[in-house]
C-alpha cells in the first residue's frame, strides 16, 4: 500500500475551504493509502506565536481532523514536534539546500517583505523541514494546493540531490492537486483563495464559526448582476465559488445544482446554501466538541506519536548512515 502524507499548521481554525479542498478528501483516501496526518506545529513557530494559544490550536486542529472523519484505526494522526525525526531529517536536507533556491521561494519572499523587524531564519529553512516531514515516511503521494506547489518541486529536487550523493535512500513523492471545484475562494473577493488568516472576517467561514453568522456571510457573498446560476470561473467567479461550496457540502454535482436552480434567482440559491452551511456547521461542531473535550483525544495522539516515531525511525537511520553521522553499529 502506498503512503500519503499531509500536514496542516495549527495557526488558526481551518475554513470550509480547507474542509472541501483537503480535509474531506482525506477521509475518502483512508482505505486506499497508509495515511499520515500531521499537525505541523514546528512550522507554525516560524512566525511569533502565543504559547497558550498555540497549545489550544494544536488540540483544536486534532479534534477537527477527527470530526471530519479521520479514523485513527486507519490513519496516523500526530503532532510534528512529538516526533524528533522531523527536525533531525530537516537539518540533513538543509545542508544540501542552497541559499539561492530557498530565497527564490515565493512564500519566503512574500512573508519576508512583511517583516519590518527582521526576517527569521526559520522562514528561510521552512522548505527543507517540509521536505523532511514528507520523506521520513517514504511518502508516495502528497496532496497540496497551488500555494505549496513550489515547495513540492523543491522537495523533489532535494530528494534527487540526496539520492544522487548518497545512493537511492529516499522515495521521491508525487504531487496530487485538489479535485476540480475543490478550490474555495474568498466570499467578498472570489479572485483570491479563501484564507483563515484574512483580515476581513466576511471573506471566509471558519469551521468553528457560529452557524447563524456563517449563514449571513453566504447571503452577503459577492455574485454578479445577471442572475443566472451557472459555473463559470472566469466570467462569474462569485456564483461559481458558491456552487463549489454547495457541491462540496452536499456531494451533488455542479451540473445537477445548475439544473435544480434553472430559472431561479440568486436570493433563492443563497438562501438554500446558507441553510446547508448552517446545518453542516451545527453537525460538525457537535462532533468537534465531543472530541475536543474527551480524554480519548490524548490517547489517539499518543498512539499516533508512537506509530509515527516507529515509521520515521528507519528512514532517519538510513539518512544518517548515508551521510556518515554517529557511530557505526
Curated annotation (Swiss-Prot):
The residues listed in the UniProt record as binding L-tryptophan, with positions renumbered to this chain, are 133
What is the top-level taxon of the source organism?
Bacteria
Per its record, the protein catalyses: tRNA(Trp) + L-tryptophan + ATP = L-tryptophyl-tRNA(Trp) + AMP + diphosphate + H(+)
Chief localisation class:
cytoplasm
Query: Which positions does the motif 'HIGH' region occupy?
Result: 10-18
Q: Name one GO molecular function term.
A: ATP binding
According to its UniProt entry, the function of this protein is described as: Catalyzes the attachment of tryptophan to tRNA(Trp).
**Which family is annotated?**
Belongs to the class-I aminoacyl-tRNA synthetase family.
Name-wise, this protein is Tryptophan--tRNA ligase
Native organism:
Staphylococcus epidermidis (strain ATCC 12228 / FDA PCI 1200)
Upper lineage = Bacteria, Bacillati, Bacillota, Bacilli, Bacillales
